[in-house]
């Protein structure tokens, strides 16, 4: 499934590693094979790298997995996000997404991280180290 409405050469020439870019509807035909419960299940596994970020007022709380069912039951109704790294290693349908990004050198792609956020959920101010 090619990226829809994306000129990959233009993206590489003007956007890649230069500016934040949102590719809306680029994967319009993609049907996600997992839901929030599936992602939470992965986050309970010992070998899966996962994080929960919860906003409490002006503070951001970070917790690292693995998590238990009780951890999800104790979450507030809103303002939290679950992040799970390397989902492509666990869900083949997610791994198939990498084919759509073959125009990016493979050595530049680490993994596919999947997030699930409640209403108002975010990762807060942060920077990524790769």
Name these PLM-found stretches.
Residues 1-6, 10-14, 28-32, 40-130:
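Active-site region of the double-stranded beta-helix
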Residues 20:
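Short hydrophobic/aromatic beta-strand or adjacent loop that forms the aromatic wall/cage
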